[in-house]
């Protein structure tokens, strides 16, 4: 299986399955001298890990990360950073009834057709359990970006089902289990999740991820445009079915006179482009939105087929999220941070000596 690595200069490779012994990743390209301990990654891992609230899957994993290499006396050495998280709460028996079934909406059928064999326990490699290592690697990138360049990457839940937020208060995001920036919508989210759990169903969501204090110049035209790579990294997250940069699909109804981000000596007047122009960062906030589908791991009976070519009914047992968008918030942050880290190192390598007299706004 290829496709387990993302990035060019800051490269992240993950491995492991949902019910395997452990998950792991290798980070190549992290500059030396960055102070780093397991604690630096644990905060974001705790935000993502299962079993932390009544609104998410009750699989209980400590998700305690171990640094295997690349760090000496609390500092990165510039060599490969090896990270490992052990799986401790697998309940593979929950999946024994579906080992020959293809769950609709999941990767069971496509994995089986592509490889001729699949790990049916919790989805194996296709499970969102894999994203724990992305979050760990993303925490390294987030620390470097913030500590060395003052870049901050944050995300929040902006919509669940038909319930949309009306305002953004960054102080509220960590005050509730939904990563919701609008305190007035928390009860509505709570009511929706309770209803879904009672019905055995699930719902989709929309997340917004923002990077602030990003310098001008990140991005490599034409095929490695920053927005193209941001879309690629966010689209690689499990259950993501759509990505918007800036105003996204709203531009369809906008006019050029409305959409263009006019400039003054004091700065840009608007940010419809989401902080990226011509595939290169403009110095404004980078803003992206992702749409996540409702999980198909539900107890509502559904029609499917077996690997032996028989018709069957499927009811997914096990422990699952009624809305995968909740725990995807730190994952979205991680993927944007990894992409920005990679492009920052690439920009530094090629353009560190570029001098321009053009004022920065």
Swiss-Prot record:
Residues 38-58 are annotated as: Disordered. NADP(+) binds at residue 48. The keyword Coiled coil does not apply. Pathway: Metabolic intermediate biosynthesis; chorismate biosynthesis; chorismate from D-erythrose 4-phosphate and phosphoenolpyruvate: step 7/7. The keyword Transmembrane does not apply. Residues 38-49 have a biased composition (Basic and acidic residues). InterPro entries: Chorismate_synth (IPR000453), Chorismate_synth_AroC_sf (IPR035904), Chorismate_synthase_CS (IPR020541). Homotetramer. This is Chorismate synthase. It comes from Photobacterium profundum (strain SS9). The lineage of its organism: Bacteria, Pseudomonadati, Pseudomonadota, Gammaproteobacteria, Vibrionales.
């Amino acid at each position: 299986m290829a496709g387990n690595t993302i990035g060019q200069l800051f490269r992240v490779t993950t491995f492991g399955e949902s019910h395997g012994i452990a998950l792991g990743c290798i980070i190549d390209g992290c500059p030396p001298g960055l102070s780093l301990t397991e604690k630096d990654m644990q905060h974001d891992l705790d935000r993502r890990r299962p079993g932390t609230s009544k609104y998410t899957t009750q699989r209980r994993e400590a998700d305690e990360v171990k640094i295997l290499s690349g760090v000496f006396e609390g500092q990165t050495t510039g060599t490969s950073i090896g990270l490992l998280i052990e799986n401790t709460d697998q309940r593979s028996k929950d999946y024994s009834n579906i080992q020959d079934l293809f769950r609709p909406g999941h990767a069971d059928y496509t994995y089986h057709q592509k490889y001729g064999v699949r790990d049916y326990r919790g989805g194996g490699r296709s499970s969102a359990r894999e994203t724990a290592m992305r979050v760990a690697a993303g925490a390294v990138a987030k620390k470097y970006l913030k500590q060395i360049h003052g870049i901050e990457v944050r995300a929040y839940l902006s919509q669940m089902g038909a319930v949309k937020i009306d305002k953004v208060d960054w102080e509220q995001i960590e005050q509730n289990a939904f990563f919701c920036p609008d305190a007035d919508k928390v009860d509505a989210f709570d009511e929706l999740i309770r209803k879904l759990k009672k019905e055995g169903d699930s719902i989709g969501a929309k997340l917004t991820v923002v990077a602030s204090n990003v310098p001008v110049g990140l991005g490599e035209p034409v095929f490695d445009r920053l927005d193209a790579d941001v879309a690629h990294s966010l689209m690689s997250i499990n259950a993501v079915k759509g990505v918007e940069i800036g105003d996204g699909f709203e531009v369809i109804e906008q006019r050029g006179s409305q959409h263009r981000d006019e400039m003054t000596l004091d700065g840009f007047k608007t940010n419809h482009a989401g902080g990226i122009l011509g595939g290169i960062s403009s110095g404004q906030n980078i803003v992206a939105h992702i749409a996540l589908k409702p999980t198909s791991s539900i107890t509502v009976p559904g029609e499917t087929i077996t690997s032996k070519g028989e018709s069957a009914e499927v009811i997914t047992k096990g422990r699952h999220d009624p809305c995968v968008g909740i725990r995807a918030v730190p994952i979205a942050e991680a993927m944007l941070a990894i992409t920005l880290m990679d492009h920052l190192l690439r920009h530094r390598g090629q353009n560190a000596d570029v001098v321009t007299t053009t004022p920065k706004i």
